[in-house]
Amino acid sequence: MGNTVGAPIVSEYLEDEIGPIVFKKSLGNARFLKTVKAYHSEEGYVVVKIYKKRNTKESLEKYKIMLKEIKDNFNITPSFNIMPYQHFIETDRSGYLIRQYFHNNLYDRLSTRPFLSMIEKKFIAFQLLKALEQSSFKGVFHGDIKSENVLVTTSNWVYLSDFACYKPTFIPEDNPADFSFYFDTSGRRTCYIAPERFYETNRGAPSNNELTPKMDIFSLGCVIAELFLDGFPIFDFSQLLSYRKGEYSPEPIIRQRIQDPNIQTLILHMIQKDPDQRYTPEKYISKWNTVFPQYFSFAHQFIPELMRLENDDRVMCISDKFDEIVDIFKNNSITNLFKSNLNQSTNSNTIGSFRVSTPSSPILISNNNNNNNNNNNNNNNNNNNNNNNNNNNNNNNNNQTTTTTTNTNINTTQQQQQQQQQQQQQLQRPLSKLDDIGKNIANIIYKTEQFVKESDEFDKTDITNIKELNIQTTPTINTSTINRVIQTSKTNTNLDTINENSNNNIGVNRKKVTVVEGLDLFLSVIYTAVKHCQFPSTKVKCVGSLLVRLAEMLDDECRLQKIVPYIMSMISPEQPTLVRVEALRSLAKVLEMVQTFPPSESSIFGQYILPSLSQLSHESTDEIIRIAFAEILPQLATTAKRFLEIAQHYRDPDSEGIMESRKDRAKFRVYDSDLQEVQDQFFNKVSDLLTKDSCNTLKKIILSDIYRLCVFFGRQKTNESVLPLIITFLNDRDWQLRCAFFENIVAVCTVVGAGSLESFIYPCILLALTDEEEFVTEKALSSLSELCSLGLLRKPILLELLVKTSPMLLHPNNWIRYGVVSLIVKICQSLSKADVYCYVKPKLSPFLVNLNGNGNGNAEISDTITESNLIQLLDSPISRESFNKIVKFIARNRINLSSSINSILANDNDNFNGESFNSNGSGGGGNPNLVSSTGGSNRRLRALSNKFFVPNILSASNSSINSTSGDIGSLLSQSTEESLAFLRQMTSIGISDSDQNKIIKCFDYLQSKKCKDLESANNSEGNVIVIRTNGTTIISSSNNSNNNTLSSSTTSSNSTTPTNSTVNLHSVLNNTTIIQQQQQQLQQTITQQSITQQQQQQQQQQQVSGGITTGGTTTTTLGRSSSPQLTGLNPSILSNSNNIQLSSSVVDVTKLPNSIPIRMVKIRGGDQSLNNSTVSLGSVAGGNIITPSTSLSNSNTMVGNNNNNSYNTSTSSSPLSSSVLNSSVGMNNLTNSNANSINNSSGINNNNSNNNSVNSNNYNNMNNNTMNNSVNLMNSNQIGQQQQQNPNTVKIDLVSPSDLNVVSKKYYIRDPKMGLSTILKVETNVECSIKVPLPLPDLGSTDSVLGGGLLSSGGVGGGVGGTGGGNINGVSGINGNVGGGGGGVGVGTVGSGGNGSIGGGNSGINNGSGGGGVNSGGNSGINSGSTNSSGSLYGNGNGLDNLPNSTWRPMGILVSHFFEHKAAVNEIQVSSDNLFFATASNDGTVKIWDCQRMEKSVTNRARQTYAQQEGRITSISICEKTHSIASASDKGSIHVFRVGISGKQKNGNIKYTNLSTVKNITETTRGNIVSVSHYSTNSSSVVTYATTKGGIHGWDLRSQQDAFNLVNDASLGLIQAFLIDPNRNWLVTGTSRGFLTCWDLRFGIPLYSVRVSNGRILKFAPYMLAKSASESWVYISTEQDNVIVFDLSNKKTTRVFKRSYEQPPQQQPQQPQPPQQQQQQQSQMNRSINMTSSTTTTTTSSYDFGTENLKTSSYSQLPSNPLVNSIVNNSNINNNNNNNDNSNNVTIFKPTPLVRALLNPPNCPFLITAGDDKRIKLWDWNNLPQSYYVSIGKEPPPFYTHKFSNDTSNAYEIHEEVWHDTSSSSFYSNSAMFGGGGGGQPMSTSLSSSSLSQQQHQAQLQLQYQLQQQQQQQQYINHLQQQKSKTSISMPTVHHQEPILDIKMMEVPNPMLISASTDGVVKVWK
């Protein structure tokens, strides 16, 4: 190219000379080739090197050929590491070299973070040698290898580029100009040219001017040396010349700076001066195998194939094959693994079949592989000899892997088999032994203790007197659970799961994983793929799983330098939420793995990580991210402190904490300041999360691991900051948050010390003992037990706890009782024996069981108090019912009787110390014993209980209580009046005697117990049911939500009972008029409350409320008292009655208005009760949710009182649900066997028999979706049964979005030695792995019929009609067979056409002959058996190709007449393949008719009849692309049934089998169904229906659930019709008030409502003109205007089709016709009339669309001709003119008939209407005068004209038919005047005097024409009469005699109309 300097390059030249390339910027300052970066519109960024020619004569053709050869060589066989120039262009001025642009070259990459690791440098050197090997193999040599020409991608893949074949091979050594111009492009003066390429000037250049591979080896050696020297070049130009002369050597630098001696020798060998001593690239790779391990070859082949996949597939492939890749890199051997994978993927018989097992499954080797293994061993001998060292080193590693590899000797195989058998035995060994469990738990506790000790050592804090620290360190380990497992064996917890979770979560003794070298090569590949992933799930899997697994096998430097920064980038706000969550968790795991790091990384938390995470604690961050951040905070804090301690150890590894000098103190000051800074940062994060966030879940997460945070903050900061922050959680209403506080507070106590424990934490625990939620109380007791076991409580506090908690031994909750027992045992263990005897035993004695039945004494406790002994001696607890009553009673009335109760319990001999009941705990003088074990006070207390607490005490006055016992009298004399009133009140509210005694013992605890339901009880006074029975009125209030029973007690006339528990009890005992006041207040409340529709509906559904059965017949009675008395009873007061008998004969139930809700049941005593509108089951601790049953309750229920005081409102009670036993909801109900419950069938079940639940079925109104669908909750064992009875019961989510995987891919790694082009095989499986919704029920698809035998295998249609021939009855003009002509369905040839058809001959209509007819019958068959686009069975023959089109018109020829229906036929539907059509009738049947039989004969019968549906069938719809029909009944039911078609009969007719029901949908509550429709999508098959209550509902047949529920506005009127868009985008409804509502089906919202008519909207029809601009147009049949065309998009009317009367204009008198002519015309008319035979058809129609008032009468049937239009009778005109000469022109309103049927055939520019006038009219809107009557109906219409006009004000067209018969009063006239059948053209303008004569002449011609047609028609009628006389069948009428309700069109065998009327008649017309 010459040693010339190029002229300056102008950037504009670029686009002018080489096309669409835009200059971006210059690259470098080279003089020989100017390099620029440019942008190509199609290829992206490119590099263009420009050579500026010196003159235009200079030619570059030689170099162009060389560059093209290089390009072609590498393009034929793709090379992985070569990037040649892609394009070379030569112009007159320049030459251009173009290749792809890369962001980095090797020189730039060496100075870019993250820096290359040693293994990455080796892999780059390996790729460079491979690139040189590839180019040498092609005979191509580079000539200028340097770091600038080595391109590096983001995945660290290397390309060798810029082949310099155009540069000189040899340059002079004494002239640096050539070197600077050609080779020193970067200006660094680095020189990597081989020494032999320099020559002395005096000797001249060598004659051989070609490059050799040895030259490139030297240059590559220099590049590899620069790579390992981190960018330091070993030669510049002067040094290379000195090295050539032997004056300089780079060996010292290489030996000093490169640590690996193998790399040193490799570089020194490659840069030898003698080229003959240099090796080839492949020999360097094989000889230096220690530098280039064997897995490099695998990675070099695997990574390029991986890069060809999509980004998501790359990540999935690495993740799926991660274990195999690890094995390859770990063992440095890939051959055996490749063979295993190859066998698995190809199923080869010559290699052996192995199943590669997962780590959790054993390895199996098939027996038929022995011979193959021998062959493999023989074949592998050579490899073993060559790689003995490697094989020996890798045997141990192979034995430890879980993937099967083929070994080289039999011994190794036997060892593996033995090891596999041992693994199988270990996997099959049970792990449920108690000894193993104890060891596992002990291991957990030991690890926890080790963690605590290490943390305390870090904090320089010693915790004394801690022998066993059973605290929770992770969220999954619960100390109470561990203790419960060790002490008892009653729990069902999976201990293996606990052990597994504990091992996974404790990171102190984490199992070390061996570092696998080389895996970091995939990090860059993964990062590049994840950056451009399409699916967030791929990122989640990569960040959450793949990177963590890689981090476990990489070194610490790689974790900190490469993995942590990338994970931090995935936490940025630009990433999806789930990706950020997984990134946070992975960050904590990876940082915890780091054990060693340089000192500079010690501040990574304070300077990098925490500032980057600062935005996560902000309120705007997603809640799930904040929760994940709170979850990892303790882990991050512990890791941060460990980093600081490791850094401190590096600063002074020998001091061991002894600060002897200033230097040491300075080091520690650095540590303290760094720790303080990090602590402040972490506390700010914790404070922001806890104070700025109201999410309780986040607070629970922090509490679950609060101990590690406390250890991190230290004692001082925990006391000052953390403890006050978490104590505020106790003020929260969420009881689960309070539970979490007490679950984890013990660990905090170990950090804060005894002072903070007694001052702050202990009082909070005492308050929790009386918490309203019993879960909290149980957790508080557990925390006290832990504190006692740790020895953190002093003796006075222990004694105080004994006093406070001993009364709780009588608590009805077993969990609380067991917690108190555990606490007392721990207290006893901390006290001496003397203290136990003096303090503990007296305190416990009153709560022990009474061994002597006469009350002589309680049980005596042994000296050693254990949990088992104490539980056995405890007295039975207070019943749950009594406990709830007394707690609410005390809280509501604020009773404080502590001193009075103590005085009752006191006596002279053995004093009960009052201090035992006081809240100040122990202390004070006196005997601390509560009761002596054998003292007499116990007997007195028993006597007091037996004699004082009796029901008769209520009848006595307060001052006159008599007793026969002197002891009782003395006790009563000491009691106060207030205490006596309290005792009476306990009896009055229904507390038993035994419970009263226990209540007195634990009164102090009950007095301080909080009552959660107090507020709700006070607000429920209005929930009352009034019952009158025999003059006695009982008002029952349901304010007790825990006990919803309703009972009564017999009361005497002199006794009074409280009416409401909110009233003061003293006033209740002395005032009997409170009930009247309550009634007045109740009436006022009722008048103020509004009754909503939802509450009213739900109230009607509830049949049982509080034990009272209401409804149509009430069967509940109450016991009658002796005298009429008004008594108000609380349900809790009534529960103690003994004589309750219910009978329907004596009860008058007055139910209060529905606005007063009646509480039914409560799942848990502390929760809000369930109301009537919704059932909201909150989350519980156990995770199980109790759902009420849906079993129906009996309408007649007997309620009685048994011995257990339980009321059973069904014949049998259900057993306890096993799921409830494991639920935390049952904790409140773990009480004794005394039960007061109501059980309705099977439903809500508590844990034992002592439950206060109401099991009812009145939970049917839970809203499970946005459509307010009524869904019943049911138990899991009842779902199947209930769904069979009522399939609409439960909405089940059948398909989860996460399961809808589109494809699944499997990846296989194959052996590269097999000679395959790729080693990565990807199998994509779409069919087997797609998870779709439930299959659609068998609806009889039309496609299945095609393969079922209806068509021949060749697809050629047969002839149904057969050949024509013969005349019918010899009548001329009707030639051919009636059914002849037209091919049909079946095997055979296309049937030949007959000689014409009906109406043929010389009629002038269709002069067809031979193959003629209406539609050339011979061509109407199947054309080659193909199907049309609409899914029809019929082919694209001429008969269907032209159907329907703009030229087709119905002729009005009657083909068939059916009269099988006994009532009105409401709707007709034709199947999509035109095999059959169906009719729905008011007689409750749906009949199926065969379309193929229509032209065979007039008399046909229905093929099938469906009569299994109740009520009238109002609408039907044929399911799309199926043979199933959806029929709707006025009873609110929809049946979907399948029409069975099983093939073809011998005569060619289709064979119909039985009908089968597919689905029954019963929606009686939604109203009568007006119309039904069906549509299908790719994922659903929806039956849509509208009801009279304004609902539009969709039921999905595939998922068996509601697809949508829409509600039309009731103010718009009742829905009369609806129509669905064929594209499923919109839906329109029409109402009785003329309103049209358009709905958007995609979003389920109403778009608008507009009034289109003042009358009713009767029907919709789609506008079917193809490819019109009016796709949103619809036809609407209305009352006022017969038919309008409405544009839904513009909300306006575009056309109107109407009929009206018009007053005739004034006309000149006409000359009368001669009498002879009048008589002649009249005689002709009479003859034409007499030619017809009249039939009478009468019926009683009950059709509900407005035809109930239509009169049915006998009338004469007139003949008709379809093409003769209405004509005028001249005599009639004259008579009208004569009669109207002297009359006044008065316009009288005359009603027009309603249009009830609309039809717009596809692609036809006309509309067909029918309705109350019994006529079928065709409206041609393109040519209105061409409109005519297809059927003239019962009587001919009068004279009419067509009128077209434009309404300019409303902008729509009016197509009007104007009637001029002024003598007729309405369209329902019974005159016998003949008006014409329809063959002629009607008058298109109104009459005028100037055109009267012309009209008369036209009328005469039309009359003659009509008479001729009537003669031909009469011949056909005569033929039918003859057939009638032969078959004794009544002659059918030609036209409809009743209003027509529907018309449809079928296309096969010929296009024909189907019409149906209210008398049940169905007619088919040509």
Swiss-Prot record:
Task: Give the matching InterPro entries.
Answer: ARM-like, ARM-type_fold, HEAT_type_2, Kinase-like_dom_sf, Prot_kinase_dom, Ser/Thr_kinase_AS, Vps15-like, VPS15-like_hel
Active-site residues, record numbering mapped to chain: D144 (proton acceptor)
GO terms, biological process: late endosome to vacuole transport; pexophagy; protein phosphorylation; protein retention in Golgi apparatus; protein targeting to vacuole; vacuolar transport
Q: Which reaction does it catalyse?
A: L-seryl-[protein] + ATP = O-phospho-L-seryl-[protein] + ADP + H(+); L-threonyl-[protein] + ATP = O-phospho-L-threonyl-[protein] + ADP + H(+)
Give the Low complexity compositional bias ranges.
367-407, 1106-1119, 1192-1263, 1703-1722, 1732-1742
Which Pfam families does this one have? Answer: Pkinase, VPS15-like_hel, WD40
- Sites binding ATP sit at L27, G28, N29, A30, R31, F32, L33, K34, T35, K49
- UniProt xrefs under SUPFAM superfamilies: ARM repeat, Protein kinase-like (PK-like), WD40 repeat-like
Q: What are the alphabetically sorted keywords of the record?
A: ATP-binding, Kinase, Nucleotide-binding, Repeat, Serine/threonine-protein kinase, Transferase, WD repeat
HEAT repeats span 558-596, 604-642, 717-754, 756-793
Location of the Protein kinase domain: 21-303
The answer to keyword Transferase applying to this record is: yes
Intervals holding WD repeats: 1460-1499, 1508-1547, 1564-1605, 1610-1649, 1790-1829, 1935-1966
Extract the ranges annotated as region (Disordered): 362-407, 916-937, 1036-1062, 1106-1130, 1190-1263, 1699-1743
Q: What class of enzyme is it?
A: transferase
Superkingdom of origin organism: Eukaryota
Q: Which family does it belong to?
A: Belongs to the protein kinase superfamily. Ser/Thr protein kinase family.
What's this protein's name? Probable serine/threonine-protein kinase vps15
Name the species this protein comes from. Dictyostelium discoideum
